[in-house]
Swiss-Prot record:
Belongs to the YciI family. This is Fusaric acid biosynthesis protein 2. Disruption phenotype: Does not alter fusaric acid production. Signal peptide: none annotated. Pathway: Mycotoxin biosynthesis. Induction: Expression is positively regulated by the secondary metabolism regulator LAE1.
Length: 104
């Protein structure tokens, strides 16, 4: 029997100076993540920013925040390890933060 899924707040910063690489890899990253999103395992996600940009300026993304429903923190680490953003050196896996979370 599978364990009950629990919610976790996941924050993973980008490595320095990878904004251009992030933009190139965004489409394959989103395609790979789509099954988890469609299954309701990732009900919320977005980019963290270095600062808010003025209208028309490039958005200064510097990481990702998401809610992941998983059996364990180890399962989340495995999901993040296999993501193209980790494999191709966008996310700083060593600075991954996983927090137990409860949506309200």
């Amino acid at each position: 029997m599978a364990s009950e899924l629990k919610e976790y707040l996941v924050i993973i910063p980008d490595l320095p100076d990878v904004l251009a690489k992030r933009q190139v890899l965004l489409k394959p990253h989103n395609q790979d993540a789509a099954p988890l999103v469609k299954a309701g395992r990732v009900p919320f996600f977005g980019s963290t920013l270095a600062h808010h940009s003025a209208e028309g300026q490039q958005v200064a993304e510097n990481g990702t925040v998401m809610i992941i429903k998983a059996e364990s923190e180890e399962e989340i680490k495995e999901i993040i390890r296999k993501d193209i953003f980790t494999i191709e050196g966008v996310w700083d896996f060593g600075r991954l933060s996983i927090w137990p979370f409860k949506s309200k």
